[in-house]
Structure formats: C-alpha cells, structure tokens
Amino acid sequence: MPKNKTHSGTAKRFRVTGSGKLRREQAGRRHILEKKSSRVTRRLEGTEAVAKADVKRINKLLGR
C-alpha cells in the first residue's frame, strides 16, 4: 500500500514536539487587534496543545 501524502496546509499549521505531541498557534491574533485589549492579545501568545479529539485526524493528514 502506498504512503499517504502530507497535507501541506496542515503541515504549516501544526508542529510535532520531540515527544510526539501536537502544538498549534492560537486563533484571533492576526488582525483587528486595535479593539482587543492587551490582556487578550497577551493571552493569545504562544502555542497550545491540540485537543485530544483532533489528534488522530491531524496525524493522518500529516502522514504519521
């Protein structure tokens, strides 16, 4: 059976950690930031772990 191809859009949005967990950027910090408080924009900094329900599907899209 042939290998699955990596979904390039998914590959750009998710990172695999050394232990194999998935990380993602948080939504809501790209534009229209003027009306958002500094507290909100700081809270959206950094990455977050992918929800347990989504891990299997994302791994499949990443060809893992």
UniProtKB/Swiss-Prot annotation:
Start and end residues of each stretch annotated as Disordered: 1-27
Keywords in alphabetical order: Ribonucleoprotein, Ribosomal protein
Gene3D superfamilies: 4.10.410.60
Gene Ontology cellular component terms for the protein in this record: cytosolic large ribosomal subunit
One Gene Ontology MF term: structural constituent of ribosome
GO process terms (BP): translation
InterPro entries: Ribosomal_bL35 (IPR001706), Ribosomal_bL35-like (IPR021137), Ribosomal_bL35_sf (IPR037229)
Bias (Basic residues) ranges: 1-15
NCBIfam families: rpmI_bact
Family in the record: Belongs to the bacterial ribosomal protein bL35 family.
Protein known as: Large ribosomal subunit protein bL35
Species whose genome carries this gene: Saccharopolyspora erythraea (strain ATCC 11635 / DSM 40517 / JCM 4748 / NBRC 13426 / NCIMB 8594 / NRRL 2338)
